[in-house]
Amino acid sequence: SAGANIYMLGQSEHTWKVNFCKFTNETRNGFEDSSDSGSIKFIAAVNGICAGGGYEVALACDEILLIDDRSSTVSLPEVPLLGVLPGTGGVTRLIDKRKVRKDLADIFCTNADGVRGKKAVDWKLVDYIAPPSKFNDLIDERVSKVSSTVKLRDGKEGIKLKSLNRNITNEGIQYDTV
């Protein structure tokens, strides 16, 4: 996700902006609370630009996977583009949750272009990368691994979702069911 449309937010009424921010904060906090309780785990699979609020949602997940296609990036561009700090916990999640070094977090937050590939892994901005030809395999592998850590209540089985059948054509990607 490229995050919020800042220009749209700038033209919105104050109460709408407040509710928007509350909702996005509650979403991220809900991810982390569900994860901490062990009942649900979240994986962000990033294929493209993941900036601002979009990256903050990814930061709330248990793992971040990034396609290594030389153009997909993660960024918190609020400082260089808007002159404000990421306002909904992005910097805190970078340093406290992901254990990104403070000097790298400073560089990251002042670079509007973002970070990609191996550098994103080295800086602890994402957990895993894979080239486009292996990205879906990485997703399947990590989902299998992470889902095995989910604590089911009272010995009950969780819901097993059937896989979506994906058909990739020149016109785009189609699914049998959504």
Spell out what each predicted region is.
Residues S1-N29, P80-G83:
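Glycine- (often His-adjacent) and acidic-residue-rich active-site loop
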Residues N5, V57-A58, A120:
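Hydrophobic/aromatic residues within transmembrane alpha-helices
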Residues V46-N47, I67-R70, P131-S133:
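Short beta->alpha connector loops at strand-helix junctions that form conserved
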